[in-house]
Amino acid sequence: MKIAILEDYQDAVRHLPCFALLDGHEVDVFTEPLDDEAMAERLAQHEAVVLIRERTCMTAALMDRLPLLRLISQTGKVSGNVDMAAAQQRGVTVLEGVGDPTAPAELSWALLMAAYRRLPQYVSQLQGGHWQRVSDEAVHDTIGRALKGDVLGIWGYGKIGQRMARYARAFDMEVLVWGRAPSLELARADGHRMATSKAAFFAAADVVTLHLRLNDATRGIVTAEDLAGMKSTALMLNTSRAELIETGALKAALQQGRPGFAALDVFEQEPLNTNDPWLHMPNVVATPHLGYVEQKGYELYFSAALRNVLDFVARDKAS
């Protein structure tokens, strides 16, 4: 089978132990983002594509231009990046893999700590020859602070949110939870405090961290009004999906000083270009969507996705 692995930015997949599962198949690994025109041209002879999370959108229009496509193998769970109805109509099988909260939760906590202690700014200044300086501008040259005693506001008490709560307890933070009723009840059973309202949640939290799935109900669920209700010293942490926040609202809120800071691993347009304002805001720590990007997680995700390809081939031969 001719197989394409798409948007492997770091050319990491071919170096994983599980890549050997595809021995005997013709495999092309594409490391650069491709627009629909380029994908239609380069994938015209491929029967299967392996997607890395939501990096690639498989639309009806694109599938129409891939006459040999028979299988889409998704690392992790299938999300809105695949038009499932279009795939079914065109006889394209879509198989999903497994997920794990460990890597995204750890990345979230690392970002939180880096932002709180201003680590990226200190490192940048140190490399420029400046000792114990955060910024060349006095207004931004503020020291960081410890987590102990601060309030971690968790919106979405699923697997990642629960890990964040455990990390917070280890650092002597107070946990405040907001979300749907089942989520709140689970958090209450774990001994955490519930916010009485969304407004109270944003007002009380020193850090707001979002751990929600993106769908029609959650798109833009964090509004400009919510952000304006945060403390001027507060941090907005988003490692889930940029579209959970009303378009343009967070940039405007940061410029107006509420919240005072943001730590972001996700953006509406990815990859970011070097001129993107997010990369030049002194009160923002930005990482290039690394939540699930680490060796153990990749091996887990791709082992499942590549085994799905092999299972598909085996079923096809048996039929």
Task: Give names to the regions the model predicted.
Residues 41-44, 57-62, 181-277:
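Rossmann-like adenosine-cofactor binding region
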Residues 8, 157-158:
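Glycine-rich Rossmann-fold phosphate-binding loop(s) that bind the pyrophosphate
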Residues 90, 97-151, 166:
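Phosphate-binding beta-alpha-beta segment of Rossmann-like dinucleotide-binding domains, i.e.
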Residues 1-98, 223:
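An N-terminal-biased, well-structured beta-alpha scaffold segment characteristic
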Residues 161-162:
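N-terminal Rossmann-fold NAD(P) dinucleotide-binding loop
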Residues 5, 152-154:
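Hydrophobic Val/Ile/Leu positions in short beta-strands of Rossmann-like dinucleotide-binding domains
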Residues 69, 148-151, 224, 233:
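Phosphate-coordination loops involved in phosphoryl transfer and adenosine-cofactor binding
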Residues 293-304:
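A conserved FAD-binding loop/helix module that cradles the flavin
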